[in-house]
């Protein structure tokens, strides 16, 4: 008799995706982050669900409901900090996952890559709205500043902002709708992740060499299941170290002050994982220009497959491109640092140079490096 996992309509899908899936024999630990992102998402949905049971999305009670969760709910503090720091782990995995895609040329799978970019946008939107919910000072002012950017859109800008706010300022209506969206979006992300996986399994995984691995495939289970379990254990270890020893390390102290529309914090800044984009936004003196640069800093990922000029797929055997890639990483770290600094000399000019460098690297220098490598190899 044929095994049930190969015949049952539902089990067959799971079997073909996680058990009998033919996988390249040489994929490194950089290929672990997809499964880690899945674990992060499940963890965020579960902790978020338990937080939502005690949270109230009203301006008068939101802050105190979060305090109540931390003080009075059984293990509420650990659920809250796992959710807050889980978001940080989520973005660390996201950035490494995207970086892996850039380095090894995984963006050649166009559908998978583009769904991934949509996933990145959806996750950023979810994280932004989640940051508003505790209704601390940084929640309120972050929401005010970021939503206000839409007013830079010509003609419809002001109406659009007031429509999003549900009034003439960030208030009760804004908080309620942000909570509703923050609750629904992770499920949309989960659905998109399935589409992401569907497209990936149409082609099969890429591998570090960027060469077809059809001649040498191994079953996903047990080889990569055990590898993913190791990755998951390390992820949970890192998360719990953060939660239990330094839960507020990545947060902003201003968010422990209840939201006050009459008192602006001296430095308004988003969570650390948005700082690179925030630095690009701030480095352009024009409001509309800044908003466009902010959007393009992520949207530029869609252009990456079109800018691929190399005859090779992966950067594994391309030292000049490798050099450009690591300069890009250093540039993004610089932007992250600048995003958290006040707007004063010398930070302004460093931010502007790093922003120019970011776009220059992706649009000009990396394609140029690839062309030079092709010529050096007489291709």
Swiss-Prot record:
Cofactor: heme b
Pfam families reported for this sequence: Cytochrom_B_C, Cytochrome_B
Predominant place of localization: mitochondrion
GO molecular function, one term: metal ion binding
An individual GO BP term: mitochondrial electron transport, ubiquinol to cytochrome c
Binding site for heme b b562: 83, 182
Record-listed heme b b566 binding positions: 97, 196
Keywords recorded for this protein, A-Z: Electron transport, Heme, Iron, Membrane, Metal-binding, Mitochondrion, Mitochondrion inner membrane, Respiratory chain, Transmembrane, Transmembrane helix, Transport, Ubiquinone
InterPro entries tied to this protein: Cyt_b/b6_C, Cyt_b/b6_C_sf, Cyt_b/b6_N, Cytb/b6-like_sf, Cytochrome_b, Cytochrome_b_C_euk/bac, Cytochrome_b_N_euk/bac, Di-haem_cyt_TM
UniProt similarity note: Belongs to the cytochrome b family.
Complexes and interactors: The cytochrome bc1 complex contains 11 subunits: 3 respiratory subunits (MT-CYB, CYC1 and UQCRFS1), 2 core proteins (UQCRC1 and UQCRC2) and 6 low-molecular weight proteins (UQCRH/QCR6, UQCRB/QCR7, UQCRQ/QCR8, UQCR10/QCR9, UQCR11/QCR10 and a cleavage product of UQCRFS1). This cytochrome bc1 complex then forms a dimer.
Miscellaneous comment as given in the Swiss-Prot or TrEMBL entry: Heme 1 (or BL or b562) is low-potential and absorbs at about 562 nm, and heme 2 (or BH or b566) is high-potential and absorbs at about 566 nm.
Primary role: Component of the ubiquinol-cytochrome c reductase complex (complex III or cytochrome b-c1 complex) that is part of the mitochondrial respiratory chain. The b-c1 complex mediates electron transfer from ubiquinol to cytochrome c. Contributes to the generation of a proton gradient across the mitochondrial membrane that is then used for ATP synthesis.
Name assigned to this protein: Cytochrome b
Species in which this protein is naturally found: Alcelaphus buselaphus (Hartebeest)
Gene from which this protein is expressed: MT-CYB
């Amino acid at each position: 008799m044929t095994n049930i996992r190969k015949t049952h309509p539902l089990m067959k899908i799971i079997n073909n995706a996680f058990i009998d899936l033919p996988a390249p024999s040489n994929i490194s630990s950089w290929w672990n982050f997809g499964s880690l992102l899945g674990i992060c998402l499940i963890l965020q949905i579960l902790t978020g669900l338990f937080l939502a049971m005690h949270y109230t999305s009203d301006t008068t009670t939101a802050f105190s409901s979060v305090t109540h969760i931390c003080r009075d709910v059984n293990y509420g503090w650990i659920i809250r900090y796992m959710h807050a720091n889980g978001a940080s782990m989520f973005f660390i995995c996201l950035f490494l996952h995207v970086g892996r895609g850039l380095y090894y040329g995984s963006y050649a799978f166009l559908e998978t890559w583009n769904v991934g970019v949509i996933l990145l946008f959806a996750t950023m939107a979810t994280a932004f709205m989640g940051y508003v919910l505790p209704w601390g000072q940084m929640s309120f002012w972050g929401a005010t500043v970021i939503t206000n950017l839409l007013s830079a859109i010509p003609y419809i800008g002001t109406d659009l902002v007031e429509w999003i706010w549900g009034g003439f300022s960030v208030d009760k209506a804004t908080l309620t709708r942000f909570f509703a969206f923050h609750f629904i979006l992770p499920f949309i992300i989960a659905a998109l992740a399935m589409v992401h996986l569907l497209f990936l399994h149409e082609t099969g995984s890429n591998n570090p060499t960027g060469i077809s691995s059809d001649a040498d495939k191994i079953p996903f289970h047990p080889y990569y299941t055990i590898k993913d379990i190791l990755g998951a254990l390390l992820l949970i270890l890192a998360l719990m170290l953060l939660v239990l020893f330094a839960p507020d390390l990545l947060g902003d102290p201003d968010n422990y002050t209840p939201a006050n529309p009459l008192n602006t914090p001296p430095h308004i800044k988003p969570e650390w994982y948005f700082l690179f984009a925030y630095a690009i936004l701030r480095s352009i003196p024009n409001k509309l220009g800044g908003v466009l640069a902010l959007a393009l800093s992520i949207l530029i990922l869609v252009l990456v497959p079109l800018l691929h000029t190399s005859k090779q797929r992966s950067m594994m055997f391309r030292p000049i491109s490798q050099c450009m890639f690591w300069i890009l990483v250093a540039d993004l770290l610089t932007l992250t640092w600048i995003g958290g600094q006040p707007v004063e000399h010398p930070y302004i000019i460093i931010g502007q140079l790093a922003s120019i460098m970011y776009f220059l690297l992706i649009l000009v220098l990396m394609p140029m490096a690839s062309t030079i490598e092709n010529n050096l190899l007489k291709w």
